[in-house]
Amino acid sequence: MPTFLLVNDDGYFSPGINALREALKSLGRVVVVAPDRNLSGVGHSLTFTEPLKMRKIDTDFYTVIDGTPADCVHLGYRVILEEKKPDLVLSGINEGPNLGEDITYSGTVSGAMEGRILGIPSIAFSAFGRENIMFEEIAKVCVDIVKKVLNEGIPEDTYLNVNIPNLRYEEIKGIKVTRQGKRAYKERVFKYIDPYGKPFYWIAAEEFGWHAEEGTDYWAVLNGYVSVTPLHLDLTNYKVMKSIKYLEDSP
């Protein structure tokens, strides 16, 4: 019976992680270790300067106080599972998409990345929608993908970023293996004044959007397909290595 380590960045109370937890129980043991709050946008931060505490919510269900998604992967693997590798690290289901360059901010994607760094095949799941998300329907798709990965595996140094349209299971057209797209929006910094006359700021996007080039993650979900983008840990831009060889020249 397979074992799954399930994390997220929306917090242990998120309907996304709870829907996926329930859906995965038919496949094997599901160990949930999730933050105690919403940490969307926290990226791949790991806590080195403060102690971490865990609180047990239920059987195989824990929350990490002040912990990031990457922290949750570490504590789940090293403490709860006692360094017995799970079959998969799964991160999500995120309440909203993780497409294009936004994956660099994503705690959801970073949870999967941390699993891969620890040598465990890993998948990040996100819902393409922001309101009235049908998590139970989306969880069915997640289970389908998990079954396929358990049978076929994921190449070393690779983890998967999966975005799923907010549709009923039978309405989804299929699965597309995609490349990372590019976003078509910018953040703004909004300034406000608190009751004491002090300024405070809020970083937010004016309007979400991505370039819908065929073959990209955004194109797939926009057209009713599940997007599966293979990501890897090696961030080297091999294409430009020769073009910057001039930097090796002596001054």
From Swiss-Prot:
GO cellular component: cytoplasm
EC nos: 3.1.3.5
Cofactor names: a divalent metal cation
Transmembrane segments: none
Residues given in the record as a divalent metal cation binding sites: D9, D10, S40, N94
Subcellular location: Cytoplasm
UniProt key word Transcription regulation: no
Cofactor-binding details, from the entry: Binds 1 divalent metal cation per subunit.
UniProt keywords, alphabetically: Cytoplasm, Hydrolase, Metal-binding, Nucleotide-binding
Database matches in InterPro entries: SurE, SurE-like_Pase/nucleotidase, SurE-like_sf
Catalysed reactions listed for this entry: a ribonucleoside 5'-phosphate + H2O = a ribonucleoside + phosphate
Pfam families xref list: SurE
GO MF term list: 3'-nucleotidase activity; 5'-nucleotidase activity; exopolyphosphatase activity; metal ion binding; nucleotide binding
Family, similarity comment: Belongs to the SurE nucleotidase family.
Functional description taken from the UniProt entry: Nucleotidase that shows phosphatase activity on nucleoside 5'-monophosphates.
Name assigned to this protein: 5'-nucleotidase SurE
Organism: Aquifex aeolicus (strain VF5)
